[in-house]
């Protein structure tokens, strides 16, 4: 397992260094790479991984806590770290999947102003004006910190390499901008997604089912489950293990809640997204 500090936000260097160490420890070809990322530079971390392990599937998520206030830590090789990136190289038969299960609504607009993970304008209008119009709710009702829970069932979706990914609006600001857990950039087309609580639960089974197709006989499951989805599920998150057992049988399971997930919906192209399920099945 490799680990590297994300110094000065240099995710590329951290991803490259940690992946090199993990592959060296494995001593052979990796079937998959399992991430425990640091929230913020995930897209750059994935670029660093791809530089040393092109085409190797990536599965995992970013370390989380009870709230996104920077207290979360990463762990690797018997130690805990802060502001680090950890990655494990795994050999043997594996299957993997990266899904979210949101339905497209057809309500979409082009990003006209954005910086980093903050969206300012959609179609030349305040981002929150467009979003509240789409969901038919007042900004006074769902704005500010309330957005993080409301938007779990109504995220904004982006399309890349023919796949639809989810971005989580986690906060809105007085100027009408919206903060996300994934990068925003001018020219992106964002579309409103939607899902019921029942749908969020069922999608966990779907993700593991898709991952299990990659192996003959599943022997273990690792699921990086979005912490934001857990907010919407509440106590019903306890239904997830039964959903997985119904899907693939009584297979040992390890799961964790992540603040942002990494995975490969397209072979060899790792992507960072939010409100997602990143599943790894060992064969």
Cite the ranges covered by each PLM segment.
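Small-residue-enriched flexible segments
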Residues: 1-234, 238-251, 256-283
């Amino acid at each position: 397992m490799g680990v590297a500090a994300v110094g000065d936000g240099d995710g590329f260097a951290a991803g490259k260094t940690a992946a090199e160490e993990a592959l060296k420890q494995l001593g052979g070809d990796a079937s998959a790479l399992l991430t425990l990322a640091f929230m913020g530079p995930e897209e750059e971390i994935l670029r660093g991984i791809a530089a040393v392990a092109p085409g190797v599937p990536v599965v995992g998520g970013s370390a989380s806590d009870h709230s996104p206030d920077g207290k979360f830590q990463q762990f690797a090789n018997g130690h805990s770290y802060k502001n680090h990136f950890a990655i494990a190289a795994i050999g043997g038969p594996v299957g993997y999947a990266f899904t979210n299960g949101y339905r497209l609504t057809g309500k979409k607009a082009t990003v006209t102003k954005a910086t980093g993970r903050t969206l300012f304008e959609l179609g030349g209008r305040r981002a929150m004006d467009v979003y509240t119009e789409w969901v038919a709710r007042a900004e006074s009702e769902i704005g500010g910190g309330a957005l993080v829970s409301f938007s779990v069932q109504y995220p904004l979706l982006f399309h890349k390499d023919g796949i639809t990914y989810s971005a989580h609006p986690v906060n809105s600001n007085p100027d009408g901008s919206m903060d996300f857990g994934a990068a925003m950039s001018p020219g992106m087309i964002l579309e409103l997604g939607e899902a019921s609580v029942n749908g969020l639960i069922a999608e966990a089974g779907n993700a593991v089912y898709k991952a299990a197709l990659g192996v003959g006989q599943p022997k273990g499951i690792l699921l990086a489950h979005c912490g934001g989805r857990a907010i919407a599920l509440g106590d019903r998150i306890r239904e997830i293990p039964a959903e997985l057992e119904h899907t693939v049988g009584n297979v040992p399971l390890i799961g964790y809640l992540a603040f942002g997930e990494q995975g490969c919906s397209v072979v060899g192209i790792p992507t960072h997204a939010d409100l997602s399920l990143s599943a790894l099945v060992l064969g």
